Amino acid sequence: MPKANNAVASKARRKRVLKKAKGYWGSRGNILTVVKHAVDKGEQYAYRDRRAKKRSFRSLWIIRINAAARLNGTTYSRLMDAMIKKNVEIDRKTMAEIAVRDPEAFTQLVKTIID
């Protein structure tokens, strides 16, 4: 009796890993052992950077709000302090969008918060 080696599942598993490595250069895209390492490392970077993305966007929003606040005669920290004291609940993402897209509205917002 011939040896059963479950070739269908093995081929499917290899194909799945190789599909993830589409576009990789050289042996990183076609030699299975190298592909496995490359794909694993790529997934580690993706996991790490999904979290780093959140941090970098928050800091971008803060930079934009601070720049717009300084054009209106205050600073980011003073603006946030005044917002907390007046119970104004606008998130940083929205404030940064207003600051970039509609500076006049941001000026009005700063005046209502600070005064």
Swiss-Prot record:
One GO CC annotation: ribosome
A Pfam family that the UniProt record links to this protein: Ribosomal_L20
Entry-linked InterPro entries: Ribosomal_bL20, RIBOSOMAL_L20_CS, Ribosomal_protein_bL20_C
MF terms (GO), sorted A to Z: rRNA binding; structural constituent of ribosome
GO biological process: ribosomal large subunit assembly; translation
CDD domains the UniProt entry points to: Ribosomal_L20
Transmembrane segments: none
Function: Binds directly to 23S ribosomal RNA and is necessary for the in vitro assembly process of the 50S ribosomal subunit. It is not involved in the protein synthesizing functions of that subunit.
The family this protein is said to belong to: Belongs to the bacterial ribosomal protein bL20 family.
Protein name: Large ribosomal subunit protein bL20
Annotated source species: Chlorobium luteolum (strain DSM 273 / BCRC 81028 / 2530)
